[in-house]
Amino acid sequence: MKKIVIGCDHAGFQLKNQVIATLKDAGYDVLDVGTYSEESCSYPAIAHKLCTKIQSGERELGILICGTGIGMSLCANKHKGIRAACCSDVFSARLTRNHNDANVLCFGARVVGYGVAMDLVNAFLEAEFEGGRHAARVDLITATEEGNFDALK
């Protein structure tokens, strides 16, 4: 089973706990990096905690939940080696792994309910990167991240 790391801000707290329980019941190894209450908190700090677990290799994939998923995805994508996608439909959650080799799924607790959230999570976790023509495009994302804009010419 894949090693998953999950985090949320105050808006995603209840949904995060539901997702964790379901993933653990399915046998996933889940690390919770917070937040641990509904008290208002800074989502960039949670995104940073999660991203460092993936960057270090301690965890393979991450899930971030905030109100819309957008703030978390913006923060996560500032971290080297992180490819975070904000998704609210299963097609995108699957293809972001297949084509973009995304390693963090973001969604909003104010956008999707538990049922859709689990559909997104399952699609994301079950999908694999297809490589091939997509690998060259992911390499260009990495080049951009490293400031090698000449690779884009």
Segments from the language model and where they lie:
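Glycine-rich phosphate/diphosphate-binding loop of Rossmann-like nucleotide-binding domains
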Residues: 5-25
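Helix-adjacent hinge/juxtasegments
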Residues: 46-86
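A short beta-strand-loop structural module common to alpha/beta enzyme folds
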Residues: 29-40
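Residues that form or flank phosphate/diphosphate-binding pockets in enzymes
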Residues: 14-15, 41, 71, 115
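Residue-level detector of anion-binding/catalytic polar loops
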Residues: 29, 83, 103
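Nucleotide donor/acceptor-binding cores
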Residues: 2
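C-terminal binding/interaction regions
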Residues: 5-7, 11-12, 90-153
